[in-house]
């Protein structure tokens, strides 16, 4: 471990040293230290030999030499000090100057030596002893030659020498200080170097740890990649399921839209039905008022009849009293009188109030109710009267009186009966006529089977009224009088004890179609000592067989006309077909039974099936009428179209003969952000964008008119660009395409005209569009995460514009799913191919490139298209997205070619190309403008619930 640490320290130190050696600052530092060392050596040299250079016995000449040497040393020291602060270039110059100064000094010394040799009278011997670091100059002067001048000069020189020594001492101190600073800085640098070495050691340890962690991270990254692949597979499966759910959702939204449309139609029809109902209600109310008036008149007649019957009964009682008197007077024959009294007692009871016996009331009934129930009891008078617990026996045949028996007594009432009968029959016939008219009117408006004959007998409502009266008071009712009019015999009805027997007897009697009112008057036996009589009027409603109960329209203003059961029944019958040209819409209408549920009366006799059948028959009749009118219109249109086609054929023949085509183009662009659809799709703003409108379009006509290209004119350039992840890429593409195609056409390497040498001009134009798309995509490298689809249409004419005979051509290139269609005659020609990631051919292309693709994959890195401009981040990953366009054939335009539709996928998600061509061609035949045609397609897209994207439409009329 120690060796490893030493090796690491040495390696770190060597690396640091090499790095310092390489740096320019370190080289300058080394140069400065070398110069400082040289200067220090020179100063030490002169300092050690100062006694030899500076002596008092030296001559002036020697002093001059010493001064020169000192000056040279001072200059050298000063120059060296300055050299430490300058750079390498200045140091080289100073070295050259030093060398030159040394040469000059040596020259001066030689010159002085020559002068001394010439001037000296006495010989002076200069000896040089070379010793390490010292030079001795021995001068021998003669004492005789010293003079005062020399002494003065020597003094001056000594002073100068002292000054120079002081300067040298100062410089030496400065150099010492500099050395101290250098020493301190060197120590600091060494300490820093040690710290750096320690840091390097720590960093190496950390580096080892990082290497280990990198290895671990690489292994984790590999695992994460595997997991990522699995997650992508799961994501693709989830996205496929999401697409399925979205398709279902779109289907449901289609159904919802159709349901809403049907609901609007139903509301309109319901409002019409309400208007009809209101008119019918008014008519019905008027007829009800008339019937009420008739009933009032009938009641008044019944009251008059009741009075007449009361008078008749009084007369009958008088006649009976007279007969009793006659019978009592005839006492001659006792046997006959006893038999007659017994029979009269059995037929007519005594009217004395002391006996408390009820008097049977003579009641006229119809022949239809002559068969009454009879109880097996005695025919005695006690059986008729009985007590409260005994049952009353029915009357025998002796109780019945024929009309011939009382012909003399009823002479007063017989003439009045036919009058009332005829009057009542008139009232009945008039009321039946009114009711029948009402039924016919309602059946005329609502259907022939609305009022159906009742299968069962009408239910009778019984009302009981108990009155305690005396036996002498005659008890009758209005209904009894009405029955008496239509009857021809008088019977006495038996009495019962309980109300249940009364109800059972009343319910057993059925009403015939001829009789309107029937009644049974029933007498109750006495209770206690007082005589009480209970009268129950069983009054049957006026109700003929085809008549239903009264219908009340009071709740027509309410919105809630359906209860839950009927609404479920109607919804179960509703079927909504998918979006199709030949779809059958079943209108959901509220039946009349639904309108009558909240009414005040019970309308159980009205069946829902009858009403549904009625509505269906009406709808079928309306549909048949509409179909007949449409067929007539279609026949007329077909005739007009045939005439137009004949004219067009003639014109086409003429145009084909002349080979002339209208060179002017009419076009229109319509676009919409479609915020509702985007909100429906839950889309949000892209980061950095202020709008959600990502569609951009161009329409340039005439294009390059000023350039005057050879053999080419009337060029039109039309394009739609649908951006994703923002509209930046679409904006760039819309600006780059016109510039790039202009460059390519001006280069001379591409041509749009026919070739006479047998070349393939279609291939030439395909090469033009391929290079155009590739150049634009290469200039969109900065759009890494943004992209767009592109659909570009070129329309041009061959030859110059002044030529009369010109042929026009059309060619389209696209990437993505913005489509274009050509309308030729009444047919649609698709000019583009949708490059979607879920397309089988695109999946096969990606597989052929060696890229794995799952069957459920519908997107490439979240993008729905497999070819686009931009998206260079995805393209660099090489996962299947390219920018190679689909190029259509070159189409020679003929007079049958009407227009071209270019639109983004927001339109094609709602309507297919064939339906769009059919929708717009009808407007084209009517002479509509391109603007109105584009507006029509835009509105159909935006109003659909399937539209969840921006919509851009270009119409080019050819």
From Swiss-Prot:
Matching entries from InterPro entries are given as: PP2C (IPR015655), PP2C_BS (IPR000222), PPM-type-like_dom_sf (IPR036457), PPM-type_phosphatase-like_dom (IPR001932)
Note on cofactor:
Binds 2 magnesium or manganese ions per subunit.
The biological processes this protein is annotated with in GO are: signal transduction
The annotated topology with respect to the bilayer is: Multi-pass membrane protein
Q: What is its EC number?
A: 3.1.3.16
Instruction: List the Gene Ontology MF annotations in alphabetical order.
Output: metal ion binding; protein serine/threonine phosphatase activity
PPM-type phosphatase domain ranges (all copies): 675-958
Coiled-coil stretches, from where to where?
142-330, 613-666
Give the matching Pfam families. PP2C (PF00481)
Q: Where is this region: Disordered?
A: 312-361, 380-421, 445-475, 491-525, 619-659
Compositional bias segments (type: Basic and acidic residues): 312-328
Q: Which residues bind Mn(2+) 1?
A: 722-723
Catalyses: O-phospho-L-seryl-[protein] + H2O = L-seryl-[protein] + phosphate; O-phospho-L-threonyl-[protein] + H2O = L-threonyl-[protein] + phosphate
Q: Which spans does this entry mark as compositional bias, Low complexity?
A: 329-361, 390-401, 452-475, 491-515, 619-655
Where's it found, cell-wise?
Membrane
Entry cofactors: Mg(2+); Mn(2+)
Which UniProt keywords are given for this protein, alphabetically ordered? Coiled coil, Hydrolase, Magnesium, Manganese, Membrane, Metal-binding, Protein phosphatase, Transmembrane, Transmembrane helix
> Where do the TM regions start and end?
2-22, 26-46
Instruction: List positions binding Mn(2+) 2.
Output: 722, 905, 949
- Please provide, in alphabetical order, the Gene Ontology terms of the cellular component aspect for this entry: membrane
Q: What is its main location?
A: membrane
Entry's family note: In the C-terminal section; belongs to the PP2C family.
User: What name has this protein been given in UniProt?
Assistant: Probable protein phosphatase DDB_G0282105
Organism whose genome encodes this protein? Dictyostelium discoideum
């Amino acid at each position: 471990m120690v060796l490893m640490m030493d090796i690491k320290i040495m390696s770190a130190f060597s690396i640091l040293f090499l790095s310092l050696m390489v740096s320019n600052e370190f080289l300058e530092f080394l140069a400065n230290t070398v110069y400082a060392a040289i200067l220090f050596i020179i100063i030490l040299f002169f300092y050690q030999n100062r006694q030899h250079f500076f002596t008092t016995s030296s001559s002036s000449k020697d002093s001059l030499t010493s001064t020169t040497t000192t000056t040279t040393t001072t200059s050298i020291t000063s120059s060296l000090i300055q050299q430490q602060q300058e750079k390498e270039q200045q140091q080289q110059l100073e070295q050259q100057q030093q060398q030159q100064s040394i040469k000059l000094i040596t020259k001066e010394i030689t010159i002085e030596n020559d002068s001394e040799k010439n001037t000296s009278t006495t010989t002076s011997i200069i000896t040089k002893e070379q010793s390490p670091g010292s030079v001795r100059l021995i001068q021998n002067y003669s004492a005789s030659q010293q003079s005062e001048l020399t002494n003065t000069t020597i003094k001056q020189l000594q002073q100068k020498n002292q000054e120079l020594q002081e300067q040298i001492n100062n410089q030496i101190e400065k150099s010492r200080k500099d050395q101290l600073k250098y020493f301190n800085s060197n120590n600091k640098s060494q300490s820093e170097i040690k710290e750096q070495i320690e840091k390097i050691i720590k960093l190496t340890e950390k580096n080892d740890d990082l290497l280990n962690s990198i290895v671990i991270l690489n292994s984790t990254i590999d695992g994460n990649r595997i997991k990522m692949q699995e997650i992508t597979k799961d994501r693709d499966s989830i996205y496929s399921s999401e697409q399925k759910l979205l398709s279902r959702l779109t289907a449901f939204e289609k159904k919802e839209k159709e349901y809403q449309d049907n609901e609007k139609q139903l509301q309109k029809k319901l409002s019409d039905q309400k208007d009809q109902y209101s008119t019918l209600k008014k008519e019905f109310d008027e007829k009800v008022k008339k019937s009420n008036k008739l009933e009032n008149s009938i009641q008044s007649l019944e009251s008059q009849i009741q009075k007449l019957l009361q008078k008749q009964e009084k007369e009958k009682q008088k006649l009976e009293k007279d007969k009793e008197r006659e019978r009592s007077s005839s006492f001659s024959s006792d046997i006959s009188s006893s038999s007659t009294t017994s029979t009269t007692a059995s037929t007519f009871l005594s009217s004395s109030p002391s006996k408390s016996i009820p008097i049977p009331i003579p009641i006229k009934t119809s022949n239809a109710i002559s068969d009454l129930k009879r109880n097996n009891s005695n025919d005695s008078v006690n059986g008729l009267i009985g007590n409260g617990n005994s049952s009353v026996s029915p009357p025998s045949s002796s109780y019945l009186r024929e009309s011939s028996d009382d012909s003399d007594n009823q002479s007063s009432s017989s003439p009045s009966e036919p009058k009332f009968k005829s009057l009542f029959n008139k009232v009945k016939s008039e009321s039946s006529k009114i009711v029948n008219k009402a039924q016919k009117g309602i059946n005329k408006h609502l259907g022939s089977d609305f009022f159906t004959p009742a299968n069962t007998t009408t239910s009778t409502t019984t009302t009981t009224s108990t009155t305690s009266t005396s036996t002498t008071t005659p008890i009758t009712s209005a209904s009894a009088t009405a029955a008496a009019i239509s009857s021809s015999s008088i019977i006495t009805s038996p009495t019962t004890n309980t109300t249940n027997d009364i109800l059972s007897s009343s319910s057993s009697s059925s009403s015939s179609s001829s009789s309107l009112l029937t009644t049974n008057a029933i007498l109750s036996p006495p209770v206690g000592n007082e005589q009480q009589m209970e009268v129950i009027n069983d009054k049957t409603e006026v109700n003929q067989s085809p008549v239903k109960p009264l219908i009340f329209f009071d709740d027509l203003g309410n919105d809630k006309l359906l209860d839950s059961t009927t609404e479920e029944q109607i919804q179960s019958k509703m079927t909504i077909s998918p979006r199709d040209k030949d779809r059958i819409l079943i209108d959901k209408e509220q039946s009349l039974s639904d309108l009558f549920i909240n009414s005040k009366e019970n309308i159980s006799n009205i069946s829902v099936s009858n009403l549904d059948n009625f509505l269906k028959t009406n709808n079928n009749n309306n549909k048949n009428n509409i179909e007949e009118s449409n067929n007539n219109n279609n026949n007329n249109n077909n005739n007009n179209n045939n005439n137009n086609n004949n004219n067009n054929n003639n014109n086409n023949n003429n145009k084909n003969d002349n080979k002339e085509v209208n060179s002017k183009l009419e076009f229109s662009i319509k676009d919409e952000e479609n915020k509702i659809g985007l909100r429906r799709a839950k889309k949000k703003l892209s980061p950095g964008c202020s709008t959600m409108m990502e569609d951009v379009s161009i329409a340039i006509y005439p294009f390059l008119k000023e350039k005057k290209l050879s053999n080419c004119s009337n060029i039109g350039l039309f394009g739609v660009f649908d951006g994703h992840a923002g509209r930046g890429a679409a904006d760039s593409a819309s600006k780059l395409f016109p510039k790039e195609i202009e460059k390519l056409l001006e280069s001379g390497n591409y041509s749009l005209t026919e070739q006479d040498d047998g070349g393939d001009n279609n291939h030439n134009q395909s090469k033009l569009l391929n290079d155009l798309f590739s150049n634009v995509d290469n200039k969109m490298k900065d759009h890494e995460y943004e992209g767009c689809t592109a659909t570009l249409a070129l329309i041009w004419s061959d030859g110059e514009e002044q030529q009369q005979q010109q042929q026009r051509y059309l060619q389209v290139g696209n990437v993505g799913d913005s489509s274009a269609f050509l309308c030729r005659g009444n047919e649609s020609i698709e000019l583009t191919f949708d490059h979607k990631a879920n397309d089988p051919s695109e999946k096969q292309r990606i597989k052929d490139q060696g890229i794995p693709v799952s069957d459920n994959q519908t997107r490439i890195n979240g993008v729905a298209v497999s070819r686009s401009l931009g998206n260079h981040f995805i393209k660099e990953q090489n996962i299947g997205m390219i920018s190679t366009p689909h190029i259509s054939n070159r189409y020679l335009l003929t007079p049958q070619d009407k227009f071209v539709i270019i639109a983004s996928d927001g339109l094609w998600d709602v309507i297919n190309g064939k339906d769009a061509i059919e929708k717009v061609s009808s407007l084209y035949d009517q002479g509509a403008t391109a603007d109105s045609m584009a507006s029509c397609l835009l509105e159909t897209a935006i109003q659909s619930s399937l539209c969840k994207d921006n919509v851009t439409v270009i119409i080019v009329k050819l």
